[in-house]
Amino acid sequence: MRRIPEPFRIKMVEPIKQTTGAERRAALEAAGWNPFLLLAEDVYIDLLTDSGTGAMSDRQWAGIMMGDEAYAGSRNFVELERAVREIFGYQHVMPTHQGRGAEQILFPELVKRCQGKAPVFISNYHFDTTKAHVELAGARAINLLTPKALDTTAPYAWKGDFDLPRLSDTIETLGDDNVAGIIITVTCNSAGGQPVSMANMEAVAELARRHHIPVVIDAARFAENAWFIKERDPAYAKCSIKEIVRQMFALGDIFTMSAKKDGLVNIGGLCCFKEDLELFRAVQVRCVAMEGFVTYGGLAGRDMAALAIGLREGMDEEYLTYRISQVAYLGERLAEAGIPIQTPTGGHAVFVDAKKLLPHIPAEQFPAHALACELYLEGGVRGVEIGSLLLGRDPATGKQEAADFELLRLTIPRRVYTRDHMDYVADCLIAVKARASDIRGLTFDYEPPLLRHFTARLKPV
């Protein structure tokens, strides 16, 4: 992969501090062996998430100083609406406080429209909050990821794709009336930040149209997905990122977005509709009740100003090349040391295959979460589990489900860390690998009923 140096100058820095091994153990025990509950000041390199943790540009900060905090009709909303229409081609724009805000106001309305008695949403892979909001809306989440993604060693280019034969069979089996929507997650986070090909998106959209099912694009990492299409599909090699984005979104009816990823902001989301004014108005009612007035949706005007700028900056090809090559570099360091990862590396994170690194820990003892804890103990690096802990229990039986993947996600914030930081992370994980056979699994001390991985407290087995 072509590598370029950081395509920016650093104008402001924030000190970070190293801690001792004893301090880290005390902090992790106080947090109930859950990295989510650690204090940020006790973390040296924070790879928990790329959501809202990036650095904004000087132009975005200038936009913040021009914030129009009018309750209704803010100038910054008009700027954001203009940016969305220009970039995505969707006419009806609704800001939300973040991506889950869009999900909580959209999904109940799609379920209401569903004519069947057993509504479902089908996705390549629902992320955690998406699945939670599907279930809160009274529906069931079905994941139909390509089986090629399950082999983390296979160098398949499009591991975020839908399994198209299973998608067709599932719709036929359940019936059109029971499918409230098809959600295309780009990139596919839970599979390793893996891209969805344009051909796969086109096939999904065609199938949905044939069955009169709305297509929802979960657009958190839309620009990274477009970059992969340009890089890996010869048919799009000469297209601009903007052109690819327009073609991707022409295949959807609605998109939700956590703008805290490719929108390059610290807070914000979007719920946008290509042309369905009736649905847009129904969702607006929920927005006013749950998010805020329809021209701010829980955001300050200054945040909308930063987002309007960030959406454009996030599609810059030079920036995206730097961004994705930084992820690839960390992946290469780990792979060279014999640490199993999801290959090829995705757009926003390196995903370590804990099932292979810690084969002695069963799924119900959460091997990827145990690995996350050990990485923190080793060097103060905070990652996050994407596996059975996140997946949760079967809502019908209450039994722990075994996830398809047991992955440690090392999520790289945008425009924050340098190559030296990546080398430090790699060195820490290599040290953990040397004692992998000594790592123990974890069990619950406290288990919340929903989205348990955020606030659960655990203890070593």
Curated annotation (Swiss-Prot):
<dbReference type="InterPro" id="IPR015421">
    <property type="entry name" value="PyrdxlP-dep_Trfase_major"/>
</dbReference>
<dbReference type="InterPro" id="IPR011166">
    <property type="entry name" value="Beta-eliminating_lyase"/>
</dbReference>
<feature type="modified residue" description="N6-(pyridoxal phosphate)lysine">
    <location>
        <position position="261"/>
    </location>
</feature>
<dbReference type="GO" id="GO:0009034">
    <property type="term" value="F:tryptophanase activity"/>
</dbReference>
<comment type="pathway">
    <text>Amino-acid degradation; L-tryptophan degradation via pyruvate pathway; indole and pyruvate from L-tryptophan: step 1/1.</text>
</comment>
<comment type="similarity">
    <text>Belongs to the beta-eliminating lyase family.</text>
</comment>
<comment type="subunit">
    <text>Homotetramer.</text>
</comment>
<protein>
    <recommendedName>
        <fullName>Tryptophanase</fullName>
        <ecNumber>4.1.99.1</ecNumber>
    </recommendedName>
</protein>
<dbReference type="Pfam" id="PF01212">
    <property type="entry name" value="Beta_elim_lyase"/>
</dbReference>
<dbReference type="InterPro" id="IPR015422">
    <property type="entry name" value="PyrdxlP-dep_Trfase_small"/>
</dbReference>
<keyword id="KW-0663">Pyridoxal phosphate</keyword>
<dbReference type="InterPro" id="IPR013440">
    <property type="entry name" value="TNase"/>
</dbReference>
<keyword id="KW-0456">Lyase</keyword>
<dbReference type="InterPro" id="IPR015424">
    <property type="entry name" value="PyrdxlP-dep_Trfase"/>
</dbReference>
<dbReference type="InterPro" id="IPR001597">
    <property type="entry name" value="ArAA_b-elim_lyase/Thr_aldolase"/>
</dbReference>
<keyword id="KW-0823">Tryptophan catabolism</keyword>
